[in-house]
Amino acid sequence: MDCRVHMRPIGLTWVLQLTLAWILLEACGGSRPLQARSQQHHGLAADLGKGKLHLAGPCCPSEMDTTETSGPGNHPERCGVPSPECESFLEHLQRALRSRFRLRLLGVRQAQPLCEELCQAWFANCEDDITCGPTWLPLSEKRGCEPSCLTYGQTFADGTDLCRSALGHALPVAAPGARHCFNISISAVPRPRPGRRGREAPSRRSRSPRTSILDAAGSGSGSGSGSGP
């Protein structure tokens, strides 16, 4: 009984953190950062119960004077237009997190870390897109802004740094090659943009997880090494 009492709050915290992750992915639409620290989200349960989530100020300096949003479906101005590949990837990730959240509530799935390949694919698909900071901030605080609109590539060292910075303890990153981790499957990813640096293209293409990742909603034990069934 005592063990059960201690375990339930931990499970609830993880569910709330996962909920926050997919809601912010949906709200950001792939063009703005995932900026709400995975821990210390004051009043999150109440906001989720009311079906609303307050997102703090916008990203770029030119948008700093806009007012903070206060209702569902009303979000700050975007900082640039997302690339098709980044937007598509984040849409798939958001849907996978939503499915994972539902399975978690039903007790079908246990908490698993993110596959390292998923993080690298996220970074590869969004490297040239705008992000507004390396971490998420608590929902009760106003968001700070970088001096300029920086890209993922300018902000994060690699995919692992991206996941650890943006998602924190809500969804930790598994060790490279881990066999039991959280991943997603993308059937078709838009072609790389012409502006991508040619010297990086070969290494990107060699990373199969960028275009083919395991299904998070239907697979509880993804293969971080990329080995198929």
Swiss-Prot record:
Q: Which UniProt keywords apply?
A: Cell membrane, Disulfide bond, Extracellular matrix, Membrane, Secreted, Signal
Q: Where are the annotated segments for Disordered?
A: 189-229
Q: What start and end residues bound the annotated signal peptide?
A: 1-30
| Localization terms from the record | Secreted, Extracellular space, Extracellular matrix, Interphotoreceptor matrix; Cell membrane
Q: How is it modified after translation?
A: Not N-glycosylated.
GO CC terms of this entry: external side of plasma membrane; extracellular region; interphotoreceptor matrix
Family statement drawn from the similarity comment of this UniProt entry: Belongs to the folate receptor family.
Name the record gives this protein: Retbindin
Originating species: Homo sapiens
Recite the lineage of the species. Answer: Eukaryota, Metazoa, Chordata, Craniata, Vertebrata
